[in-house]
From Swiss-Prot:
Record-stated family: Belongs to the class-V pyridoxal-phosphate-dependent aminotransferase family. Csd subfamily.
Protein name listed in UniProt: Probable cysteine desulfurase
Gene: csdA
Source organism (scientific name): Pseudomonas putida (strain ATCC 47054 / DSM 6125 / CFBP 8728 / NCIMB 11950 / KT2440)
EC number(s) recorded for this UniProt protein: 2.8.1.7
InterPro entries, per the entry: Aminotrans_V_dom (IPR000192), Aminotrans_V_PyrdxlP_BS (IPR020578), Cys_dSase_SufS (IPR010970), PyrdxlP-dep_Trfase (IPR015424), PyrdxlP-dep_Trfase_major (IPR015421), PyrdxlP-dep_Trfase_small (IPR015422)
Amino acid sequence: MFQPSPWRADFPAIAALQRQHQTYLDSAATTQKPQALLDALSHYYGHGAANVHRAQHLPGALATQAFETSRDKVAAWLNAADSRQIVFTHGATSALNLLAYGLEHRLEAGDEIAISALEHHANLLPWQQLAHRRNLHLVVLPLDAHGRIDQDQALQLIGPRTRVLAISQLSNVLGTWQPLPALLAHARAQGALTVVDGAQGVVHGRQDMQQLGCDFYVFSSHKLYGPDGVGVLYGRAQALELLRHWQFGGEMVQLAEYHSASFRPAPLGFEAGTPPIAGVIGLGATLDYLASLDAHAVAAHEASLHQHLLRGLGDREGVRVLGAPQTALASFVIEGVHNADIAHLLTEQGIAVRAGHHCAMPLLKGLGLEGAIRVSLGLYNDSDDVQRFFDALDQGLELLR
């Protein structure tokens, strides 16, 4: 039975891709953009662009107002207590590096940083390199058979020497939600700061920072149907005060002398130089669009398509799905077939999926794999997209076997 997407027409690129005989199933890498975002970018550039927080002239005042209004919208979307808890960066990777450098002064030799075995490189490498610089111990929390952090083992490994716990909310490879409430509460009890990589999780349902209770939460705009080049760092007010400035330049400074300077607090103190103004304004427009949708209908649509995807993969001989995916994506391997070969055949048939290690090399290596195919869904996908994928997969398997 055909399952349409009520929001498909809101994304003009989907129709353009269809005219190119392309089926887009790579939304965990980046999403297509709604018309509301395109309109906001066109309006900003077409009605007078200007820098923010600098000038008294009308274009500058209007740009600053729009920029700060977007900060308010992000704070509301995350249910942050105050918009000053929202720092704009150039991506989730940038935000995580900010945290690793900004917290470095608080760590000393022998301290521990805990991450999980499923982390994206963006939430692995900044902490790994910090551990090298400061002679710290990087503790890797193991997974259970379903692809979730093994809670019992994690609670044993997070101890009094743990200074930072940095974990993903939703795995970009396994599609599994992680047991954040128990892990965050335990880490807080041990005196550790908590960092949540929400790059995937923020896309699926509203995330409530006051309820979640982490110290820091990061995500990228482009995975949330917003523009690229924009990241968000949320921080508890007390946690933001612990960060040391790590990038220096225009507008983050309070007073500059030739031999000394004082710096602004968050958020502006961590937004050195010209920020991604158009992107931030565009993110605000995207959040307005998303807020206008029926959240229950979106969740039901994604869940139904995801079940269709999982059933179809499970019905095909030799196909093994990694872990126990819960939301919007599935990674799989095929017995006796290299992932690059099947990816090539899918690409030739106009199916846009991801193949490889998905920026999580240690995870794939731990699973004994060189790579996998990942199919990931967006709110614009419909059941015909999934069926076209299955038809192409079946043709590819017939050729390769």
